[in-house]
Amino acid sequence: MGNSFSSVRDTLAHILGAEWIWLERWQGRSPKALLDPAAFPTAQSLKSRWETVERDQLQFIEALTPQRLSEELPYINQKGQRYSYPLWQQLIHVVNHSSYHRGQVTTLLRQLGAEAVSTDFLVYFDEKTKSQR
């Protein structure tokens, strides 16, 4: 369908895998591979793992200090190459990466005739606030 990945599931698994691998890197580990999309045969299995990664991300982010955000954080990518960037830049990279692929998911859903949800950040907060009333 002219996308980076062959399906909605594979695209979502890629987003999840990238968020997971970056969290691992921020904690001093450098996994050699992303999560395998085949490990998520159902939407529920993907959602369950995503909830775990999201919880772990939140714990990590809540503990950050301004000093920690500005520190250079080295990591080794999947090809074995070493890199180092300030943590704040890595965080922005992950947000941008996920946003890019969420846009692809939206396009795929529309091509499949499904109604796509909004990926706007502020719309998310508006809806979240309304649901908490």
Where is each model-derived feature located?
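Short acidic-hydrophobic surface loop/beta-edge motif
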Residues: L73-Y75
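Helix-adjacent hinge/juxtasegments
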Residues: R29-S70
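Short, contiguous alpha-helical
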Residues: M1-D36, Q78-R133
